Amino acid sequence: MEYWYDPNHTGCLRIVDTKKQIIYGSDPTEKYWVVTYTHKNKSTLLVDFRNKKTHHGKKDLVTKYEDRNMTLHWEDGNKWRRMKNNPFLLMNTYLNK
């Protein structure tokens, strides 16, 4: 699993399941969404946003891993920043104290 921060959507969390080739997300206007992707090559993904109800524009978007896999740079200019630690570890620690 990879965890990403999306600054263009109020800093929402994105989870990329690299084994299932699925991206899970949440936005202020859509509480939960799931999209799929395929690999175009080692560093490029083609993401199918047809299942995301609030997505506007192109339904298939290309994104590329950059900055030693710390950035996902989308063709629309958005850049997701990678979170190296699982955010749920901190949440579980906080909730169980």
Language model: regions and residue ranges:
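Short, exposed beta-strand/loop patches in secreted or surface proteins that constitute
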Residues: 12-17, 31-41, 53-67
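Secondary-structure transition/turn motif
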Residues: 8-10, 24-33, 48-56, 73-79
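Short, hydrophobic/aromatic-rich segments at coil-to-beta transitions
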Residues: 1-5, 18-24, 40-52, 67-72
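Low-complexity, intrinsically disordered flanking regions
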Residues: 37, 90-97
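Tryptophan-anchored aromatic micro-motifs
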Residues: 1-14, 19-25, 75-82, 92-94
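Short, compact, well-ordered microdomains
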Residues: 60-84
